[in-house]
């Protein structure tokens, strides 16, 4: 019963549907189609677009998968929240860079580990740079 229904759709109804579609002979013929003819073509064109997309989807470029979902992988994991407080008045250098990627071996001071992290994940994180105001 089910196979007979499927066979009827494929052998009888689908060819009859395709014969009734207002497909023009040339590209210019698409311009002359009326609104009702376009509405009759929409389901057919939608199915063609879906099949085309499904055919090329494996070849589309995929986003680079991030290697790790956690940001902080190892620094002060025993604390519920990592906070480092540094008084700006205590800065002895003209410029200081602090880590924001959590990959630095000298955390909280930046050692440039974000460069490798950015390369691997496609991220764009960088350090927090504090400079003394020049007067």
Swiss-Prot record:
Subcellular locations according to the entry: Endoplasmic reticulum membrane; Mitochondrion outer membrane
GO biological process: autophagy of mitochondrion; regulation of autophagy
Stretches of the chain found on the membrane's Cytoplasmic side: 61-135
UniProt-recorded Gene Ontology molecular function terms: 2 iron, 2 sulfur cluster binding; metal ion binding; protein homodimerization activity
Record's keyword terms, sorted: 2Fe-2S, Autophagy, Endoplasmic reticulum, Iron, Iron-sulfur, Membrane, Metal-binding, Mitochondrion, Mitochondrion outer membrane, Transmembrane, Transmembrane helix
Membrane topology per record: Single-pass membrane protein
Cofactor (UniProt): [2Fe-2S] cluster
SMART domains per the UniProt record, alphabetical: ZnF_CDGSH (SM00704)
A GO CC term assigned to this protein in UniProt: mitochondrial outer membrane
UniProt cross-references to InterPro entries, sorted A to Z: CISD1/2, FeS-contain_CDGSH-typ, FeS-contain_mitoNEET_N, MitoNEET_CISD
Main localisation: endoplasmic reticulum
Note describing how the cofactor binds: Binds 1 [2Fe-2S] cluster.
Annotated binding of [2Fe-2S] cluster, by residue: 99, 101, 110, 114
Membrane-spanning ranges: 38-60
Domain of life: Eukaryota
Segments in the Lumenal topological domain: 1-37
Self-association and partners: Homodimer.
Family listed: Belongs to the CISD protein family. CISD2 subfamily.
Task of the protein: Regulator of autophagy that contributes to antagonize becn1-mediated cellular autophagy at the endoplasmic reticulum. Participates in the interaction of bcl2 with becn1 and is required for bcl2-mediated depression of endoplasmic reticulum Ca(2+) stores during autophagy.
Name of the protein described by the UniProt record: CDGSH iron-sulfur domain-containing protein 2A
Species lineage: Eukaryota, Metazoa, Chordata, Craniata, Vertebrata
């Amino acid at each position: 019963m089910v196979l007979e229904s499927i066979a009827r759709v494929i052998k009888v109804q689908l060819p009859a549907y395709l014969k009734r579609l207002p497909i023009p002979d040339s590209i210019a013929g698409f311009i002359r189609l009326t609104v009702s003819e376009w509405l009759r073509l929409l389901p057919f064109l939608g199915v063609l677009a879906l099949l085309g997309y499904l055919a090329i989807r494996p070849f589309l470029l995929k986003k680079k998968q991030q290697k790790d979902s956690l940001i902080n992988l190892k620094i002060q994991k025993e604390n519920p929240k990592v906070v480092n407080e540094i008084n700006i008045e205590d800065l002895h250098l003209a410029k200081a860079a602090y880590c924001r990627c959590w990959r630095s071996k000298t955390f909280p001071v930046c050692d440039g580990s974000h460069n490798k992290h950015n390369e691997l994940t496609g991220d764009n994180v960088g350090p927090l740079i504090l400079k003394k105001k020049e007067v």
